[in-house]
């Protein structure tokens, strides 16, 4: 009464602002979503605040360079661009060998900002594209969670994915890679498809197809979608959940999505010819059979006759399908699975057959510690969420269960795919957290009712039982309060962990290195940019640079020089040739470099600073990749009793190969640690075995301040006498 009197005493304009319960809920929901949206964006800005606005890693530099070209020259020139500065002397057809979604998105955002009279450099747009789409992903996660469960689960899912380290790892500011927009497209496609299945709406189905098209344009991970959707449809068919809604949703999404995806030059006819896409086509035809059988069953209206017809139809379908698959494979129309696809099904395949795939760190199997590092408490909420989903089975919960289980399997096979599993883990964990909190709060709000006096023996016993329940209610409520406080504590620890991981682990650009000094202060190593600046200012504009493929994109984008190989890795033989040169004696390597018109050689060395991701640690992969094409290169020649060494006990070929000489040239004169002999390698923890290195065919051109990047000039051939 007092509250009502106080409200009535307010002025009329303020009294009109009183909201109904539903309006209050809507206001709180919108406010929470807005805060989550801002949080998702801001938490990814650590690298910009700590360093500066810059592009991270290796691949993003190619994406930035192509976006700059697109912004300056237009889409037509970009789509038909032949890049002479990469893969010399082969070059690269850029438009037909990339997924353009990321570049087009950033270019459109840049044009939009310019149209709004905001003078922003294209680099700043590229740096902030991933955080912007990560914030948008929280909105999709909310809508998806609400579609699967309820609005509470949607809000929790949005909050969890906003700070989930498994997603933040590839969406921080400066991480201008395909995954920055692809995870948004992935989740959007799944949400629209589930919405289409739930409603049977053609509009939602077509929207799902356009979401799939955006995913195809952005990242090769679209293969996960085009295989998960048919698997989901197949499960629904097997479990007797076929419906007209499912028929409309899948057929519309598949047909329109296929036609749109084929417009991407890098995909083209692979969508109807590649073995990786055949499952989707097979389920499409299977759905037509189901629709036909459903129609025949309605016409016949005779169970016995329909069973006979069903038996004949299934026999014909299986026979025709098997023949079509066999003939298509034998004739070469259906291409086999790619090496990356095989490596997902068999984790040992790449190591045994395609070492260049196995050499990439993000293609390695995932350690258990990585799951805990990237998911924290979600790793324990995930099984609980699966339990709640199975408890309330529907078409939507079946989909999220399948998405969660399949993505977690692939995340275990390849560490990079934790990124794909992150949205599923957040959604399923949100269901567990939301349902648990809702049950606990319902119990806490329950009011005890004293049993009424009733006549009769049976009524008396019921009242006694009810009284016993009411007497235990306070204890249950106390337990519920304790559990609720525990849940909020764990979620708060999750938030703290995510913030710490984002700040310390995922916000360090690999092009600028940082370490702690002896006094605890931060020491910055800016050697990469120093080396690329030197290349740009001190070498001829047509100079050809040979390095391991990891640094190709950065050299081209920042050094503005032609490279022999880069991160595209489309030509294994060309990369193997570079690996052979690095693994050979100097005179043999010189002949290879002359055949490739190499002017400078760039190597990365961490023996002075303790930087472990240097070329000496990558060298065995150069040997394996080179030996895979050129049998003259044999890995055992560089090992001693199966052990990789760089000290006095190292193999003779190791001590005299080009890579060893370029990394350790003049290093034997240098004292790196107090109390250690000259030539002490701080990464390997040993004194090098060959200190008296002489170069005959190359000469040192430049070494950065901390010796991390070393550049050598290839001497011109001597005149014939």
Swiss-Prot record:
Sequence motif WWDYG motif, location on chain: 548-552
Motif SVSE motif in this chain: 359-362
Pathway assignment: Protein modification; protein glycosylation
Site description Interacts with target acceptor peptide in protein substrate, residues in chain: 59, 362, 618
Xref: Gene3D superfamilies: 3.40.50.12610
Record: glycosylation sites: 560, 567, 571
Cytoplasmic-facing ranges: 1-25, 149-150, 200-201, 239-243, 298-313, 391-396, 440-471
Lumenal side: 47-129, 169-179, 217-221, 270-277, 335-367, 414-417, 493-721
Catalytic activity entry: a di-trans,poly-cis-dolichyl diphosphooligosaccharide + L-asparaginyl-[protein] = N(4)-(oligosaccharide-(1->4)-N-acetyl-beta-D-glucosaminyl-(1->4)-N-acetyl-beta-D-glucosaminyl)-L-asparaginyl-[protein] + a di-trans,poly-cis-dolichyl diphosphate + H(+)
A GO term from the CC aspect: endoplasmic reticulum membrane
Localization (cell): Endoplasmic reticulum membrane
Location of region: Interacts with target acceptor peptide in protein substrate: 548-550
Membrane topology recorded in Swiss-Prot or TrEMBL: Multi-pass membrane protein
InterPro entries per the UniProt record, alphabetical: Oligo_trans_STT3 (IPR003674), STT3-PglB_core (IPR048999), STT3_N (IPR048307)
TM spans (from-to): 26-46, 130-148, 151-168, 180-199, 202-216, 222-238, 244-269, 278-297, 314-334, 368-390, 397-413, 418-439, 472-492
Cofactor section: Mg(2+); Mn(2+)
Site label Important for catalytic activity, positions: 170
Amino-acid positions noted as binding Mn(2+) in the UniProt annotation, renumbered to this chain: 59, 177, 179
Motif extent (DXD motif 2): 177-179
Keywords: Endoplasmic reticulum, Glycoprotein, Glycosyltransferase, Magnesium, Manganese, Membrane, Metal-binding, Transferase, Transmembrane, Transmembrane helix
Main localization (coarse): endoplasmic reticulum
Pfam families for this protein: STT3, STT3-PglB_core
Subunit-level organization: Component of the oligosaccharyltransferase (OST) complex.
Protein name: Dolichyl-diphosphooligosaccharide--protein glycosyltransferase subunit STT3B
